[in-house]
Amino acid sequence: MLSLSKNWNTLIKPNKVAYENFPETNNKAKIVVEPLERGFGLTLGNAMRRVLLSSLQGAAITSIKIPAIEHEFSSIPGVKEDVSEVILNIKGIEVKMHVAEKRIMKLKATGPCVVTAGMIETGHDVEILNPDHVICDLAKDKQLEMELTCKVGKGYVLSTNSYEDNLPIGEIAIDALFNPVKSVTYKVENTRVGQVTDYDKLIMFVETNGDVLPEMAVGLAARILQEQLQLFISFEEQEEDKQVKTDALLFSPYLLKRVDELELSVRSANCLKNDNIIYIGDLVKRTESDMLRTPNFGRKSLNEIKEILAKFNLRFGMDVPDWPPENIQELSKRYEDSYN
């Protein structure tokens, strides 16, 4: 009977996830995942994007209360904008909450001034992430007082669908965007492993409002997908599958790959062959200094091999317990599907 584990163990797996933040802000990041089986870049990229933009918990202002104002079709004395415009501006305020319970913030301002989000009295449990965001223009000698309620939630909740059905008279519900992720884009490019050049490389660009860092947002989205997909695994692994998994924990199966299967220059390949380096496991146990002492092996060859090892999440100078194993040829054959 075909081993069930071959359905997933024989697929190539990503050996690295690289995060690169943009210099101007920590709220934007480029995430690169490679290598992936052909088609998996689009599959994972689309799934991650949908979860990132819909399912993460965040905080938002859900209602406001202004003295003597009962609905959004009113005007506020001394305020240039009408209430509907003020509400639209308040929807753009980005908040971060350090507690799960709702909090009420207060705003007091005296004109003439431009009222901004930074003027809101938040307390210790709430943080305004864009304090320069403009709320309204207040005329000279006029005062503005307002209470703003913020809560934790997910997604986009319309004021008409608000879970606060019994708001007090004078408290106005507003549309709430809880999601801390502002934008997600992705693209898929080809990447190379050995002689195969059409594996997928997934490149994602994620921007948040600062409530969570992009790296954390991506991790949370992956965890949500993992939790949702777990239910579909309705079988038990066979004993040989469990044994293979246990054996694989000793060291990476990539160490069993022969170095002559790597796409090396003729000079580098000959140097390794002359130094009796047969498997990648033999190679990674050497230090860079050891390699540079090899006859005819220079810095160019060293950098070439380092780049290839990095694709497998390997490096020179690794400590590999019990290497080489006694049955190395048998193991290399058994795990051939895992690294090819």
Curated annotation (Swiss-Prot):
Alpha C-terminal domain (alpha-CTD) as annotated region, ranges: 251-340
Transmembrane segments: none
EC number(s) from the headed UniProt entry: 2.7.7.6
Enzyme class (EC, first level): transferase
Pfam families for this protein: RNA_pol_A_bac, RNA_pol_A_CTD, RNA_pol_L
Catalytic activity, reaction form: RNA(n) + a ribonucleoside 5'-triphosphate = RNA(n+1) + diphosphate
One example GO MF annotation: DNA-directed RNA polymerase activity
Statement: the UniProt record of this protein carries the keyword Transcription: yes
Keyword tags: DNA-directed RNA polymerase, Nucleotidyltransferase, Transcription, Transferase
Gene Ontology CC terms: cytoplasm; DNA-directed RNA polymerase complex
Record-level GO BP terms: DNA-templated transcription
Region span, Alpha N-terminal domain (alpha-NTD): 1-236
Superkingdom of the organism of origin: Bacteria
Signal peptide: none
Domain commentary: The N-terminal domain is essential for RNAP assembly and basal transcription, whereas the C-terminal domain is involved in interaction with transcriptional regulators and with upstream promoter elements.
Subunit architecture: Homodimer. The RNAP catalytic core consists of 2 alpha, 1 beta, 1 beta' and 1 omega subunit. When a sigma factor is associated with the core the holoenzyme is formed, which can initiate transcription.
Protein's job: DNA-dependent RNA polymerase catalyzes the transcription of DNA into RNA using the four ribonucleoside triphosphates as substrates.
HAMAP family referenced in this protein's UniProt entry, alphabetically: RNApol_bact_RpoA
Family: Belongs to the RNA polymerase alpha chain family.
Descriptive protein name: DNA-directed RNA polymerase subunit alpha
Species classification: Bacteria, Pseudomonadati, Pseudomonadota, Alphaproteobacteria, Rickettsiales
